[in-house]
Curated annotation (Swiss-Prot):
Taxon lineage: Bacteria, Bacillati, Bacillota, Bacilli, Bacillales
Organism: Shouchella clausii (strain KSM-K16)
SUPFAM superfamilies for the chain: EF2458-like
Coiled-coil intervals, chain numbering: none
Classification via Pfam families: DUF1507
Protein name, as recorded: UPF0358 protein ABC2396
Domain of life the protein comes from: Bacteria
Family, similarity comment: Belongs to the UPF0358 family.
Length: 93
């Protein structure tokens, strides 16, 4: 594979991971805005499942050397920070 093809694949992989992360972020934002039922088990389960799936996607992309480990960790840490905000908000209600 040429360097350009590898770079293109890496950029595409990162963009796909970012898109999946943005979907999870939207779920978090919706829950923060509409915190009508604090700690809804179903909602928590969906978020946990999506986060786990994304972490597996990121791990796979890192192992294929399509995404740098640091970039993958940044995606997850940003979402974990937002999840922590959601948890704090639900505890206040």
């Amino acid at each position: 594979m040429t360097t350009n093809a590898v770079t293109s694949q890496s950029e595409k992989a990162y963009a796909l991971l970012q898109a999946d992360a943005e979907k999870i972020q939207k779920l978090i934002e919706v829950q923060l805005e509409n915190l009508t039922m604090p700690q809804c088990p179903l909602y928590e389960e969906v978020l946990d499942t999506r986060m786990f799936g994304l972490s597996r996607e990121i791990d796979f992309a890192i192992r294929l050397e399509l995404v740098e480990e640091e970039k993958g960790k940044m995606i997850l840490s940003e979402l974990e920070r937002k999840l922590a905000l959601l948890h704090e908000a639900s505890m206040r209600k």
